[in-house]
């Protein structure tokens, strides 16, 4: 499995409209093999969300496209930003440096 983190932030003045869209189910669905395993929300001034996904190794490219398509649908909200980050476990990273 591959892990992908998506960091999202948006300003408070769009929160109500953003949440209506988020809860409406109108955003493109994730591919069935993309599993969100964590979602954390916190706030400083902006609302910030951290999502962690699992994607099978052999579906990585298609999974990343699916995640990108979903999050791109939120960019119509002024101030909404997201970043997709491919991650690996520490033990996998150490192997790269041996």
Language-model segments: residues:
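Short S/T/G/P-rich N-terminal loop/turn motif that feeds into the first structured element of a domain
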Residues: 1-65, 85-98
């Amino acid at each position: 499995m591959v892990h992908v983190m998506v960091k999202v932030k948006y300003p408070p003045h769009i929160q109500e409209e953003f949440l209506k869209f988020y809860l409406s189910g109108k955003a493109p669905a994730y591919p069935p093999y993309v599993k969100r395993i964590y979602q954390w929300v916190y706030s400083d001034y902006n609302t910030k969300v951290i999502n962690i996904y699992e994607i099978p190794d052999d579906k990585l490219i298609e999974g990343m496209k699916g995640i990108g398509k979903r999050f791109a649908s939120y960019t119509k909200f002024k101030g909404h930003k997201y970043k997709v980050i491919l991650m690996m476990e520490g033990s996998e990273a150490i192997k790269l440096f041996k």
